[in-house]
From Swiss-Prot:
Belongs to the UPF0262 family. It comes from Mesorhizobium japonicum (strain LMG 29417 / CECT 9101 / MAFF 303099) (Mesorhizobium loti (strain MAFF 303099)). This is UPF0262 protein mll6455. Pfam families: UPF0262. It comes from the Bacteria.
Length: 161
């Protein structure tokens, strides 16, 4: 991919389904950071898209499925992928539980305890990110860092829903 192609194969806007509602301040902070980081640096290319990016992404949940609605910069629809949440459900649940422990720990635990929880949290996050990459394989090409940030947003949607 040339330098010009790389700057076009990216997301410039992320929208989460706001109809689900808001979550805890900690979760909302994770959402805001993930969106900011994702917009700043990402690699995102719908497979077989004959047009060019950059792209806008709307993430939502519909009937216990994860919906990736991809559009061009001008809002023209490119593709919508609907993925089952089943492969991610256990990881998201475990990740949510360990995040709650982490948020509790940063308020009252020792640095070594916080570090131990954070290592587990990062491991689960990596597992979820890889699962998401696998689920998007053949649909949307993303790199691992993009998958990590998208996994955070999937978790936020799931926690709200």
């Amino acid at each position: 991919m040339t330098g010009s192609d790389q700057t076009r194969a990216k997301l410039i806007d992320i929208e989460l389904d706001e109809s689900i509602g808001r979550s805890t301040p900690d979760v909302e902070h994770e959402r805001a950071v993930a969106i900011f980081d994702l917009i700043e640096e990402n690699s995102f290319q719908p497979v077989n898209d004959s047009g060019a990016g950059p792209y806008r992404l709307k993430l939502s949940l519909a009937e216990q499925r994860l919906v990736f609605a991809v559009a061009r910069e001008d809002g023209t629809a490119v593709v919508t992928h609907i993925l089952s949440l089943t492969p991610l459900r256990r990881i998201v649940k475990d990740y949510y539980m360990i995040c709650e422990s982490y948020y509790d720990a940063i308020r009252s635990s020792t640095p070594s305890h916080i570090e131990a929880i954070d290592m587990g949290r990062r491991g689960l996050h990596n597992e979820g990110s890889q699962t998401l990459m696998d689920r998007l394989s053949g649909k949307i090409d993303i790199d691992f860092d993009t998958a990590r940030r998208l996994f955070t947003l999937v978790c936020v949607l799931h926690w709200r829903g």
